Amino acid sequence: MRPLRYVALGDSLTEGVGDPVGNGWRGWAALLAGGLAEPSAEFTNLAVSGAQTRDVLETQLPAALELRPDVASVLVGVNDTLRSTFDIEKIAQRLDKVYESFTRQGTAVLTACLPDPGTMLGLPGVLGNPLARRQRAVNTVVHTLSERYGAVHLHAVDDPWIMDRAMWSSDRLHPGERGHRQIALRFHAMLRHRGIGTEVAPAAEPEFPPPTKSASLLWLATAGTAWVIRRCNDLLPQLVRLAAVEMRHRARGTSDRLDVRAALSVSRALAALSVQGPMGLAEQRLVTEPMGLPEQRSFPEPQPEPEAA
């Protein structure tokens, strides 16, 4: 009997950025793998810093399917929100294909709703709101599709530890070792509820001391700054435009229109997906939820309002 096989897909969060061990990264997925099987699980981490949903679908998924994993984690989408090419309909289509592919193989899929970068960076509202709106859209898609495919879903965006600064690395975008351990612990508990994993959960306390203040500042001034520039270089002009739109609607008292449009886009994105159930066994109707809420419920499609002159 072969050991349990776990494959991790995603971006820098799953790659382990923020949890340095030796000359590389460890991260929550590696910590979780240690509690999935005895003596050990076969763990493959395909996550790459900067990956978007397209990268997961076109590059990481084929490699993962060849391994025929028992468990696969798919945490991705934040980088999509940081690009000018953001398209919630395409994101929904890609994630639907990824989740369905694993479900057809009988793989248990792990997913998560994540906080938006603007909130974690403490951006002012006119800059942070557009990013928050995008991340809520991604989270709504992830949550709805997770319900559809029976994924092991972590609604991390509302967890109290998210706002604990001690859980985050110096860049405020990636968890530190404590934060990575919290993610691993929560996934381990949910997997145990489904009969997967050992009784020994990943430790909550860090194994290594946190980086010194000087080391953190050095990282931010070198690798951290380069990381932000690489992720956001094509978004900055658009973010300025989005901020201008935000300010105009705020001045007119019509900010809610932006939320309505975002919700409408999510509704259309999910409605465009096939209603055929996983593996073709039954039909399902995808319904959206109010963006950012964990409960699954029907959500009447909002009607667009005309743009104010």
Language-model region placement:
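Oxyanion-hole/transition-state-stabilizing segment in secreted/luminal serine hydrolases
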Residues: 15-19, 53-90, 116-117
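Serine-esterase "nucleophile elbow" of acetyl-processing enzymes
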Residues: 1-49, 61-68, 273-276, 280-282, ...
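Conserved catalytic region of serine esterases and O-acyltransferases that act on ester linkages
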Residues: 148, 171-174, 178-309
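A short helix->loop->beta-strand "cap" motif at the edges of active sites that frequently abuts
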Residues: 104-108, 151
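Substrate-gating cap/lid alpha-helix
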Residues: 121-155, 177
